[in-house]
């Protein structure tokens, strides 16, 4: 064993496992089905580590109370499912059900690993909000906003740094032309760490992908 011969040699695999067991590394699991997620929770309980978030979680609504009890977030699609066997049994109110579990103690996140969906994550949240209200849940727009702000920060373990508008946190802010959940609203300004990173009114910034292409062509 190389570690026995050289105890100063780092074992990156076990070092990572130690970080997980010590709670310094947050575990994110990719699961679709409820039984898969429940099994992973049982395994985490057996070996003494914490699952931070389940990703995709098409059947998360089936174990929403369990997720809330365990303090586990679920990063979910608003309305995408059925593309393979384990993704068939979806509820359009999945995000809302997870959010409202145990009297609103759930941690739901609107997720998208699609290039178009992530560009319009606010609209994905709007669809999830509409589905939840249609299902009978009384969910405010402010609550729905946490699905793409506060809860992702909590999931990543950086809530003390970002995720909400509070004094002392990173000033990562988007100024919208209207209601962020409206398809007609556009990002007017974007601030990152308090510095203006995008200004729609500025003539120095391209406004569309077409403008970007034209600029690249002109620079050649």
Name every feature range the model reports, one short phrase each.
Residues 1-53, 186, 192, 217-218:
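Polyanionic/metal-chelating signatures
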Residues 26, 65-68, 72-176, 196:
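His/Asp/Glu-enriched, well-ordered alpha-helical/loop segment
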Residues 34-38, 57-64, 117-119:
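Active-site environment of divalent metal-dependent phosphoester hydrolases
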Residues 53-57, 75:
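Short internal beta-strands
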Residues 154, 166-210:
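C-terminal cap of metal-dependent C-N hydrolases
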Residues 208-220:
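Surface-exposed acidic, glycine/proline-enriched linker/cap segments
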